[in-house]
């Protein structure tokens, strides 16, 4: 299918073939990263440095940020904004239901309550930090992509994907780790800073390495949808859901 450049303000409520699938994948990855990876610190051996700690949630980053980049690059800021809000609501609902289920009295013969609480008993501080960091980081990422696309005339996609990751992940990490772990038991201030910097650097590195894959996915979706959306005249406030 031929690809035509379209201003976002002329799209209205245009229906896209693959948007729903991209949205569902994005929300699913965000939920998995919060359930499985957010609270664990792993370590990696670096030559000349030794063992260096990093957050296990980094394993989900390659998928989540490719999808995040695709949403804005292919479908425009307004649709990406709706997906970010959907992800935010999904994380809040997951956290609420985790609290409810953990608080339910266990059956007398069920001996796994303590282990269950370790896995799903998220402390309010971590939930608050996670939601704030996700929301702010994703909107910065989307905004930078949309703005840079206008500045570059849609050329040099790699500058947008890498530039938006540098900015968005800086905001995400600077919000999440201090809010979640500064002064927490088992977390020294040095460890918080190490994990924060490592997460940011690894995510930027992932984005650089995966740039060819991002090009393939973006190219496929633009051809499948037949449009290349530019956010001319877009209202970039995050506090609205209209297209």
Residues covered by each model-derived region:
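Membrane-interface interhelical connector segments
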Residues: 100-125
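Short, highly charged, low-complexity non-transmembrane loops/tails of multi-pass membrane proteins
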Residues: 217-243
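Central hydrophobic cores of alpha-helical transmembrane segments in multi-pass inner-membrane proteins
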Residues: 59-70
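Internal alpha-helical transmembrane segments of multi-pass membrane proteins
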Residues: 151-170
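Transmembrane alpha-helix/helix-exit interface in multi-pass inner-membrane proteins
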Residues: 91-109, 130, 134-138, 169
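Alpha-helical transmembrane segments and their lipid-water interface positions
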Residues: 37, 41, 94-102, 137, ...
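Alpha-helical transmembrane segments of multi-pass membrane proteins
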Residues: 27-43
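N-terminal membrane topogenic signal
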Residues: 9-25
